[in-house]
Curated annotation (Swiss-Prot):
Function: Located at the top of the head of the 30S subunit, it contacts several helices of the 16S rRNA. In the 70S ribosome it contacts the 23S rRNA (bridge B1a) and protein L5 of the 50S subunit (bridge B1b), connecting the 2 subunits; these bridges are implicated in subunit movement. Contacts the tRNAs in the A and P-sites.
GO cellular component: cytosol; small ribosomal subunit
Oligomeric and partner information: Part of the 30S ribosomal subunit. Forms a loose heterodimer with protein S19. Forms two bridges to the 50S subunit in the 70S ribosome.
Identification of the protein by name: Small ribosomal subunit protein uS13
Pfam family, one: Ribosomal_S13
SUPFAM superfamilies: S13-like H2TH domain (SSF46946)
Family: Belongs to the universal ribosomal protein uS13 family.
Superkingdom to which the source organism belongs: Bacteria
Organism, as annotated: Francisella tularensis subsp. holarctica (strain LVS)
């Protein structure tokens, strides 16, 4: 298994698809990384040479991925909650943040229905 950014990349997948298993790298960024490293995106990870894997590692290291990105996102949400702005209050109450309706929808965000006790 190739290990890039602290993640074991599945060896039986194509390079582009394998890179997307890293948190913070989507399909477009994976294609850009392959193009920068001169790696064919359709080659499977197990067929890459050690130099190619090392070049992928150095290229991925230029981006904020995995734990650093997760920490950054959670700190951004925490900052919004500390400010007490509208978005922060919505996060704190576990309600939709981006203006969606909540009268009939938003069950995923609100959780299971709570019956009214008489």
């Amino acid at each position: 298994m190739a290990r890039i950014a602290g993640v074991n990349i599945p060896v039986h997948k194509h390079t582009v698809i394998g890179l997307t298993s890293i948190y913070g790298i989507g399909k477009t960024r994976a294609q850009q990384i392959c193009q920068t490293c001169n790696v064919d995106p359709t080659v499977k990870i197990k067929d890459l040479s050690e130099e190619q894997v090392e070049s992928l590692r150095t290229e991925v290291a230029k981006f904020t991925v995995e734990g650093d990105l997760r920490r950054e996102v959670s700190m951004d949400i925490k900052r919004l909650m500390d400010l007490g702005c509208f978005r922060g209050r919505r996060h704190r109450r576990s309600l939709p943040v981006r203006g969606q309706r909540t009268k009939t929808n938003a069950r995923t965000r609100k959780g299971p229905r709570k019956p009214i006790k008489a």
